């Protein structure tokens, strides 16, 4: 069973790894830069990030490996692929290689890296097994909310969108929402500014909107709100 960590706990954990990342690449928080999850995974966590076909229907976007294991996938044309994965492998579905999938790809890498972080920090609480995830939204197991998936999603968001970086991007984009209301329309200049922020940070529109709502920059209940979410 996963240890029950709050959003604040996960934010502190993310901060430690972001500090290591910034130190490794000579980045200062006085001039913060977006976090590249693949560089974080490889240079800071020692993970091997690979891109391979994982499914033919989009049901599996990524997996993280703690033990040597085999993985078989049948592609749409009937081709059977058999791969052997090793510990510390993070495998991302090659369908996410397109530029249009940058946000999804980055979040998937960060999510799988988060599983490794949590397993390393709390080895008695996280099973050493292959973890597959099917989508960016919260994954439920047996119809019940999963703490492990919620924590991996939340830690991934904290790694990609730490508060100090989001605040810096808000200032850079001159985002101004005095009443906290955002209209998803080209007529609202803030909409384009937030799209620009998302592109700079390598995340999706949905991801940055949720983060801005959590930071109370935008009013309203975060979309995809999960029963276990602690804001």
What are these regions (language model features)?
Residues 1-231:
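Active-site hotspot residues in diverse enzymes, especially metal/ion-binding acidic/histidine motifs
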């Amino acid at each position: 069973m996963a240890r029950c960590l709050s959003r604040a706990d996960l934010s502190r954990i993310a901060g430690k790894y972001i500090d290591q990342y910034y130190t490794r690449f000579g980045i200062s928080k006085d001039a913060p830069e977006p976090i590249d999850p693949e560089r974080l995974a490889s240079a800071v966590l020692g993970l091997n990030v690979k891109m391979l076909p994982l499914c033919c229907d989009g049901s599996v976007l990524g997996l993280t490996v703690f033990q040597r294991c085999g993985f078989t996938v049948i592609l749409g044309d009937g081709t059977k692929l058999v791969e052997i994965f090793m510990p510390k492998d993070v495998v991302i579905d090659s369908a996410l290689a397109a530029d249009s999938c940058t946000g999804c790809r980055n979040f998937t890498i960060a999510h799988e890296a988060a599983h490794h972080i949590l397993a390393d920090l709390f080895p008695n609480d996280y099973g050493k097994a292959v973890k597959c995830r099917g989508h960016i939204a919260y994954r439920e197991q047996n119809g019940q909310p999963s703490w492990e998936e919620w924590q991996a999603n939340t830690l991934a968001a904290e790694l990609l969108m730490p508060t100090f970086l989001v605040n810096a991007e808000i200032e850079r984009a001159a985002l101004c929402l005095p009443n906290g209301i955002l209209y998803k329309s080209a007529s609202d200049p803030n909409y384009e500014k937030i799209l620009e922020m998302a592109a700079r940070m390598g995340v999706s529109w949905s991801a940055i909107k949720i983060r801005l709502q959590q930071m109370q920059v935008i009013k309203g209940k975060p979309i995809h709100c999960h029963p276990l979410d602690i804001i």
